[in-house]
Amino acid sequence: MRGMKYSLLAGAVLTLGALAGCSGFSYFVANVPASFGSFHRTRDLAYGSEARQRLDVYAPKDTAIHPLVVFFHGGSWTMGRKSQYAFMGAALATRGYITVIPDYRLYPEVRFPNFVEDSARAVAWVREHAQELRGDPDRIVLMGHSAGAHMAAMLALNSDYLERAGVPSYSIVGLVGLSGPYALDPNSDTLRTIFAVPYTEDDWRPVHFVTNRAPPTLLLHGLNDDVVSPTHTEKLRDALLSHGASVETHLYPGRGHADTAASFTLVARSRTPALQQTLAFLGRVTAQNDARTVAMNRRGMPGMTVRVPLTDSK
């Protein structure tokens, strides 16, 4: 009976939790455990004057200085909100990472590049307030799911956004992308409106901005993703490798678009080893206190791609 309940809960998250169709019930199930646990949560801190320029902070309860993770939610740049990813903040904060999840303005209120600029502004706020958060301003990892992974990659790979916001590139020590559209080709009327002239694919594709100065990167993607093709992850991986950047890639057979994020919830953690792989990566890239030294040593670090054989827990 206990196993059956677990399967039903996991199924609710995975069946109803695909990017564009996330139901209130699936998020409710995923986030119930995030209401408890050994972390502090602070909601709705303003990083700008607009209604959606707000962020939530999930922090370990101890008083030590911790690395910072800024996580951007998905939603096709048209929907989604930070509260839906409370499970992500809880999963990382209970493991020693101050996790900040911002909202950002969406279409039709804004178009590209305004939501990327909002994201840069949120990172700038995090760095400016790092001491108050008990975070290290020079150990920041950018992370996101789906559209949020696109924005995290844009910030990590195109330094102009963060530099204009006052964030030095050396403070970004890692990038984690879950199921992101890194070689975006707008294929609907809505997306063509969001990513419209005068901008072109050279402006909105993270793969276009890859250099040997890219931060160490972890890319996770389900091979059965029918929302964002895993070829996006493969193209970004190949671009990073061709420039001598450090990239670790995990491709999950039989897993879809929601699974990479759902694996951070208690009810669906067995879907992929994404949480364990992310924690291992975060541990490596944030271990060095001198972020400037980390930035100077990015070139020549090994890359790897793993197709992970998966077995569901019974």
Functional labels for PLM-detected ranges:
Residues 24-63:
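N-terminal cap/lid segment of alpha/beta-hydrolase-fold proteins
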Residues 34, 50, 177-209, 215:
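Mobile cap/lid helix-loop segments that gate and shape the active-site cleft of serine hydrolases
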Residues 65-75:
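Short beta-strand element of the alpha/beta-hydrolase
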Residues 80-84, 88, 100-137, 267-269:
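Catalytic nucleophile-loop/oxyanion-hole region of alpha/beta-hydrolase
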Residues 121-190, 202:
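Primarily recognizes the serine-hydrolase "nucleophile elbow" in alpha/beta-hydrolase
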Residues 219-221, 225:
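Short beta-strand/loop motif that positions the catalytic acidic residue
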Residues 226-235:
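Conserved alpha/beta-hydrolase "acid-adjacent" motif
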Residues 234, 241-314:
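C-terminal catalytic histidine-bearing segment of alpha/beta-hydrolase fold enzymes
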